């Protein structure tokens, strides 16, 4: 844009789309490893306090996946906490990311269970745990990313 002053000057504006992509990239790059570490802490919490599921105990299995998802979303929230300008917005991001963490943990479990070669139970549990933790971290950040894209699309920076 050319300004109409004594001298011709150009105002340079950065594209909102390019800035948004860069910010999203940084948020995911920061949020993913922190969410993975937090999911690992959640698995330690599970080992201490949540009863181990027996075969067919869907409730205990779901609780363990939910705990890992909640821990992953809480860790990933470090990268996403200021997405909105209100406390309700931060809570919304956390809830959406927690749902994503739960879905990601479940997806990681079922994908890992199907495709991980398991010569013995110990190796299966190690690799399956890694798949669940990464799935929770990825799911939490993916849902937060979708929320950020939706908020940018609708021009919402404040959740009332």
Sequence positions of predicted segments:
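N-terminal signal-anchor transmembrane alpha-helix
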Residues: 4-68
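Transmembrane alpha-helical segments of multi-pass membrane transport proteins and ion-pumping complexes
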Residues: 36-44, 72-77, 101-113, 140-145, ...
């Amino acid at each position: 844009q050319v300004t109409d002053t004594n001298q011709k000057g150009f105002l340079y504006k950065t594209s909102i789309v390019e800035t948004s992509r860069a910010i999203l990239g940084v948020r995911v790059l920061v949020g993913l490893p922190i969410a993975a570490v937090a999911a690992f802490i959640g698995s330690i919490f599970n080992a201490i306090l949540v009863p181990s599921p027996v075969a067919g105990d869907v409730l205990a299995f779901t609780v363990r996946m939910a705990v890992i998802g909640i821990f992953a979303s809480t860790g990933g929230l470090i990268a996403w906490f200021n997405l909105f300008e209100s406390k309700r917005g931060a809570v919304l991001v956390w809830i959406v990311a927690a749902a994503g963490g739960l879905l990601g943990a479940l997806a990681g479990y079922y994908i890992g269970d199907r495709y991980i070669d398991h010569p013995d139970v110990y190796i299966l549990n190690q690799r399956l745990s890694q798949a669940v933790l990464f799935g929770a971290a990825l799911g939490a950040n993916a849902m937060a990313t979708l929320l950020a894209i939706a908020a940018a699309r609708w021009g919402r920076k404040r959740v009332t």
